[in-house]
């Protein structure tokens, strides 16, 4: 697939491993593609890897830190989830844990539960709310790994850094966009535009370009 500027857009539509948990001995260069924590479960997005390669990402699953999204002959592209400000909330009993998780669940917050603490992405209202209900939260910097990602509705969830929108607002906007694009296809899905025709398994376009991989990449001899 070609970008508007004419450069090649690579497609990432599956996760083929993880550079943190798996061992690779093929000598390929690991190249990161950076994601914010709230992008980890988006259905479709455009990203740029550290080497400048553009990607259309639609893996159909929540992306974890280190997930391998694409490979070439000499490179392995993996997800790097940026660290974020988190609220660490210590708990001292199962009763406290149950009460806290109930309160956070009502706010549709993504969270990570450990033996003696609960972690949620930072926003000021959540910080103040946990103080109000009797806990002693503090702000830390950490990776957003192993979290339970909660699907929030509009107006609920965590406020996304740098915006006045919540994770629920962003999810609803994505759904609304899909509703207004009835003929849209997932990135990497095989389909033919009206201006394309197929001969012996090769797609051709009126501008002379052709594709051997069902329209994912185009070139001209």
Curated annotation (Swiss-Prot):
Where in this chain does the entry annotate a coiled-coil region?
A: none
Which Gene3D superfamilies does the UniProt entry name for this protein? Urease metallochaperone UreE, N-terminal domain, UreE, C-terminal domain
Q: Which UniProt keywords are given for this protein, alphabetically ordered?
A: Chaperone, Cytoplasm, Nickel
Biased composition range(s): Basic and acidic residues: 177-194
> Could you tell me which Pfam families the record lists for this protein?
UreE_C
The answer to whether keyword Chaperone applies is yes
One GO molecular-function entry: nickel cation binding
User: Would you name any one GO CC term?
Assistant: cytoplasm
- Please list where the region (Disordered) is annotated: 160-194
Localisation: Cytoplasm
- Is NAD there in the keyword field? no
Please, one GO biological process term?
Answer: protein folding
Top-rank taxon, per record: Bacteria
Main localization is cytoplasm
**Reported function:** Involved in urease metallocenter assembly. Binds nickel. Probably functions as a nickel donor during metallocenter assembly.
HAMAP family, per the entry:
UreE (MF_00822)
Family membership, please give it: Belongs to the UreE family.
Return the protein name.
Urease accessory protein UreE
Organism of provenance? Bifidobacterium longum subsp. infantis (strain ATCC 15697 / DSM 20088 / JCM 1222 / NCTC 11817 / S12)
Which lineage is the organism of this entry classified under, starting from the top rank? Bacteria, Bacillati, Actinomycetota, Actinomycetes, Bifidobacteriales
The encoding gene is ureE
């Amino acid at each position: 697939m070609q970008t508007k500027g004419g450069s090649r857009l690579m497609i990432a539509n599956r996760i083929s491993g993880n550079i943190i948990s798996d061992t690779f001995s093929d000598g390929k260069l690991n190249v990161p593609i950076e994601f914010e924590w709230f992008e980890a479960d988006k259905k479709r997005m455009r990203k740029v890897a550290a080497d400048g390669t553009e990607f259309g990402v639609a893996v159909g699953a929540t992306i974890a830190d280190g997930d391998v999204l694409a490979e070439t002959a000499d490179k392995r592209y993996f997800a790097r989830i940026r660290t974020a400000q988190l609220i660490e909330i210590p708990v001292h009993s199962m009763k406290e844990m149950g009460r806290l998780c109930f309160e956070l669940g009502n706010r549709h917050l993504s969270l990570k539960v450990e033996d003696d603490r609960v972690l949620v992405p930072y926003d000021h209202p959540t910080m103040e709310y946990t103080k109000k209900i009797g806990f002693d939260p503090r702000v830390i910097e950490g990776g957003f790994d192993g979290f339970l990602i909660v699907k929030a509705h509009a107006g609920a969830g965590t406020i996304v850094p740098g915006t006045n929108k919540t994770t629920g607002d962003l999810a609803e906007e994505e759904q609304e966009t899909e509703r207004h694009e009835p003929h849209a296809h997932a990135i990497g899905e095989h389909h033919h535009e009206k201006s394309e025709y197929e001969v012996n398994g090769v797609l051709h376009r009126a501008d002379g370009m052709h594709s051997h991989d069902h329209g994912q990449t185009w070139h001209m001899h």
